Amino acid sequence: MASQDTTASNRPVAPTENVVVDELEGTPHAHCFDEEPMTIRLTLAEGESVPAHQHPDRRIVLHLLSGELSVTLGDDEHAVEAGEVVRFDGNQDVSPTAIEDSVGLLVLAKRTE
């Protein structure tokens, strides 16, 4: 039986996982890991968009790695450029549109409150 790593306080430690974002397969979405928090690479070509949708009970962090997006959140539109990080609530309509070819990393964390 394999032993599980623990911290000094005897809490179990999950194994470290590593992925190369550029090597993930799938567009517009490619899942980085199989467990929480949900982590996804978003790839959109210039002019491509994702239809309005929601991620109920999630807080979302978008780190735009390259390109430029216009992200509609509810009734508001936000310009996001490469290098920027945006955090928003998934309990609203979300629709990103690529102003130019874009790659971003999304982390969808379950709400704790």
Language-model segments: which ranges?
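A short, N-terminal "cap"/entry segment at the start of jelly-roll beta-barrel domains
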Residues: 1-36, 40
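Conserved short histidine dyad/triad with adjacent acidic residue
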Residues: 25, 38-55
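Histidine-centered metal-chelating micro-motifs
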Residues: 49-51, 86, 90-95
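Glycine- and acidic-residue-biased ligand/ion/polar-headgroup-sensing regions
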Residues: 57-74
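A cytosolic small-molecule/anion-sensing beta-strand core signal
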Residues: 65-66, 81-82, 100
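Ligand-binding loop in jelly-roll beta-barrel domains
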Residues: 90-113
